[in-house]
């Protein structure tokens, strides 16, 4: 329908996430290629959803290899792996924040990706009871540290919410730092204000956390050369 209406050149952003099958990934790749041909300024944020530390790999067995073969070529402008997914794609364990930055650059930004967000970072140099999120570009990197808020069961939609806010902010400001801060503040605010045992983020009841999120009081930013 979008193609038939001639709207491809007007698309400014594309967000992709969980893939039920590698064949769907091929459709996403073809669509991203078509959109960028129609509008070279369009931004594609690819969230390579494959698993997490507490669940292991939860996608079909062919997805990780598909990601390695097709999504590490620089076509995506932005990526958002969590620590587990970055380790899965790189084949090595992250032992420090700086190693995480270097690995993200090797896999993504050195191949043309503008920004890589690494979420759920719990390397040994991250202080206890906190979690870090990184935004990494070719020349700089920023880190935001927040208290580790664990919810059981894990709320649905956290990755989608982060990616949506990050992409939307980047489209407005073209700033990786702004996108990182907005996404982390929004997600932390939503998770902090949700009822214990709830399955979904309170996107309606806590809309203010999306429109005007509360800054995390001890957020700090740091650039890496």
Language-model features: where?
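Short, well-structured alpha-helical segments that form the helix of a local strand-helix-strand
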Residues: 103-105, 176-190
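Short, small-residue alpha-helix embedded
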Residues: 88, 152-176
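Glycine/small-residue-rich loop that forms an oxyanion/phosphate-binding "nest" at active or ligand-binding sites
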Residues: 32, 43, 48, 53-54, ...
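Short arginine-rich
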Residues: 112-113, 186-198
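Conserved phosphate/ATP/ADP-binding segment of small-molecule kinases
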Residues: 58-143, 151
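Conserved small/polar residues in nucleotide/adenosyl-binding loops
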Residues: 219-225
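Glycine-rich nucleotide/cofactor/substrate-binding loop typically near the N-terminus or early
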Residues: 1-27, 31-32
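A short helix->loop->beta-strand "cap" motif at the edges of active sites that frequently abuts
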Residues: 35-43, 112-114
């Amino acid at each position: 329908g979008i193609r038939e209406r001639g709207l491809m050149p007007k698309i400014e952003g594309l967000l992709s996430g969980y893939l039920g099958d590698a064949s769907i990934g091929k459709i996403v790749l073809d669509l991203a290629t078509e959109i960028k041909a129609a509008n070279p300024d369009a931004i594609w944020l690819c969230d390579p959803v494959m698993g997490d530390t507490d669940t292991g790999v939860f996608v079909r067995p062919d997805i990780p290899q598909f990601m390695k073969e097709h999504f590490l070529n620089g076509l995506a402008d932005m990526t958002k792996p969590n620590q587990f997914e970055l380790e899965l794609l790189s084949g090595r364990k992250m032992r420090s924040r700086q190693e995480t930055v270097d690995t993200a650059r090797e896999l993504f930004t050195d191949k043309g990706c503008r920004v890589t967000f690494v979420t759920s970072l719990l390397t040994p140099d991250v202080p206890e009871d906190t979690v870090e999120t990184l935004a990494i570009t070719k020349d700089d990197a920023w880190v935001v540290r927040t208290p580790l808020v664990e919810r059981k069961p894990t709320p649905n939609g956290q990755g989608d919410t982060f990616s949506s806010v990050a992409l939307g902010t980047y489209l407005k400001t073209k700033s990786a730092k702004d996108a990182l801060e907005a996404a982390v503040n929004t997600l932390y605010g939503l998770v902090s204000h949700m009822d214990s045992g709830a399955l979904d983020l309170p996107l309606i009841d806590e809309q203010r956390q999306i429109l005007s999120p509360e800054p995390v009081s001890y957020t700090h930013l740091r650039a890496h050369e």
